[in-house]
Amino acid sequence: MGELRSTTPTHSNVLNLALTFSLSAGETSLLDKGLLFIPTPSKVDKQALRRDLHAYHRRLKLLERFGYRSDTTREPFTLPSNWEPEEEAISEPLRELIGEDVEALNNLPRCRFPQNNLTNEERQALINLKNNKGIVIKPADKGSKIVIQDRSGYLLEAYRQLENKKHYLPLEKPIQSETQEKVREILDNLHTRKYITFKQLTYLYGDDPPRRRKFYLLPKIHKDPSSWTVPHRIPPGRPIVSDCGSESYQVAEYLDSFLNPLSQKHPSYVKDTYTFVNLLKQVKLTPGSFIFSVDVDALYTQINTHLGLQAVRNIFDQYPDPSRPDEELLKLLELGLTCNDFEFNSKFYLQVHGTAMGKKWAGAYANIYLAEWERTVFPKCPKLPTVYLRYLDDIFGVWPHSKTDFADFMVILNNHHEAISLKSDLQPESVNFLDTEVFIREKDGVLGLGTRVYFKPTDTHALLHKSSYHPRHTYKGIIKSQLIRFRRICEAEADVQSATRTLFQALKPRGYSRTFLRGINKEVKESFARGFAPAIREDRNQNLIPLITTFTPSSVSLNSSIKTNFGRLQESVEQLQDFRVIAAFRKNKNLKDVLVQASLPAHRPKRDPLAPYFKTLRYITNPHTNLSSPVWGDYSLDSKNLIYGIQCKVCLMWYIGQTKNPLKQRLKQHLYCIRHPHRNRILYDHFQAHGHENLQISGLEKGTNWSLRKRLWKERMWIKKLNCLFPSGLNEAL
């Protein structure tokens, strides 16, 4: 008999809008833990742990090599270097430490994971939800709810937006290759004119081939359900275009480094909530004043490209900088705006109006555009607010005039640019802005503004579940940061306590005990009573040596051994006295990583017949020589211009090769030569004897603009590093 399924469409942290799917008890229980919940992992990735240890040892080698200087910084927009001193070049104490650490890793006891934090039903529910291609799971656009939609409903809203010819046009095929050529031509010019170095050019070239951009939606369930695309069934979606790995991804980072500082120079700029609260403390009101909030509707998709580029040009002119390549930056920005093609449901589109959320520079670009809009619209207004503050597309102000005057003010603003539409809320007592409620209050006979915490109606306060597989200090840190936020926003103790009660009531069902919560609350309250308001600490890690591993019982045990070994090294190396090892943990996969994807999953994904031959490596070892090396970067069968390794699964021997072409193409050539013997080569003879099905290929290192000479040199280095020459490997003498 199947598991009982709930007919209730909603749960405290889950909104199920799917008509064809109902949540089982196990699925409801699983999702209610939140998308940040991490299930207890079932195994330790020893390869990754070995690579992490190597990275730590590399830091120690470099520290010794450069005279224990802690002030070294990497040039911006460059790939991290993998270079490290040879073993022969390091001191004997450090060599001994490395040996002790490696021995500690090799002798790690088999650490048992704590009790599984999911029931058998929840584990099966995770598998079922992951494999269900008929539904789409997304986090809500605002708040912390998880939204489940029918695939058909999600597609309906997506195509409603994509069929708007004003914003998007269909394409027969992607144009990324053509765009990549244009981007690289501009980058080559920047390098020729010495605005960027060769290392920066290599970084900004990006991945080859570039990853296709993906379009997806975040459901706006905070909107009035009666106004949804299909009322109460299909909410409107916020369009996002994932830019990761595209031909302009690194270029967007470079552009943002120039645009972001300029975007903060307008008079209405608000950095964050705390800046906003501090600004309001200085405001004095006249009797009869109103306060208002204004929201710019769908700002990103409504920005006129010509006006947006002109706004950027204007701010470049306003703040000239001879070291800034203005014309090239504008060309790169224009390409990012006009060549923003993407894929959705195996179809291709081009965005022709506005910009996509997902670009690194999108926020700064929108900020500059609105700053220019403000500069040109305010002279048209006969009456202006006495206070006008803006955080991106959210505006707060004080209006000392009549309601009629405010209505006239809004008409002027709404008619200034055709595409810019504003929604306003004018109130005599209080308005909501960001995560604050701003209210008019009298203090010492003076009218001013106070603030308290504002919780959106869709906010379920679904902070990290206490049983999630995280380090213990994480839970306390999350709660503490919220309580600090309450005290920095709220003016009155009663408001702090009200917000705290709301949060704690939501956290108790999520595994947090009353004693645990009260203890943190007491600690924060006492720190503020002493006049110490905890703030974000400045970077103080100049004498810290990071040891970064994925959180598991094995990594915790290894960290302890490594710190002990480092303590002994400090006794013999005086220069290390001011340094200490700090352990930082990388998270395991959470529910969002498993269940939420940018791409819409295909009903029947095509299986690449070459996929069984490919394996992702984090660490490579030649067992016939005991030589090893970490593998950095991510690779696939589409990766090109790279060094690769082929291992025989029978005898574990390695072959190192290089190719300019996609790895898939090189693999096909190797398989053809194995199946059709016509050369007397060690590699092909070996797999003719052991079977091509025992061949496994992996990417080891790649470079976007490597020449043949560079690839051949890298190939020799890898062969030497692992000693893969026959008979220790399958490479022939060069």
PLM segments and residue spans:
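Charged structural interfaces that engage phosphate-rich ligands
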Residues: 1-734
